[in-house]
Amino acid sequence: MRVVFDTNVLYSALAAKGFCEEVVDEAVAECDIVWSNALKQELESLITRRHKIGPATRVALEAYADLCEFVEPEPLDKRVCRDKDDDVVLATALAGNADVIVTGDEDLLVLKKFRGIEILSPRQFLERLDRTG
């Protein structure tokens, strides 16, 4: 299964030990993770704004990046989401032929699917992994 994690899930996984970290860890072990430089930069910016990036966070971020397949998303033909940053998540998933987007963002979750790509919450995704794994 090919998966794109939205920045909010990755931020939660890096900033706090807990459920999102568990979801990301399981996905890394069982799935192909797709990421883009645009999403990586968004995450780095978010971490920098909210916290100082310490050495441990930097190492964790680079370790995650090393496990990902990077793609270069093309801009969508027309805007899909209210927040243009959410369209980058969709474009990354398209460029990477992802099966699933994992997000906590209601603006994305309300779509349920985008061009055949399922959009799931972290809990829904973990349940899916448990069923198929």
Mark where each language-model region is.
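Residues at secondary-structure transition points
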Residues: 18, 34, 55, 80-87, ...
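Short, well-structured N-terminal submotif of metal-dependent ribonuclease cores
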Residues: 1-35
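Acidic, PIN/NYN-like endoribonuclease modules and their adjacent C-terminal/linker elements
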Residues: 80, 96, 106-133
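Active-site neighborhoods of divalent-metal-dependent phosphate/nucleic-acid chemistry enzymes
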Residues: 67-101, 106
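A secondary-structure boundary/capping signal
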Residues: 6-7, 35-36, 104-105, 121-122
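Short active-site oxyanion
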Residues: 30-33, 97-99, 117
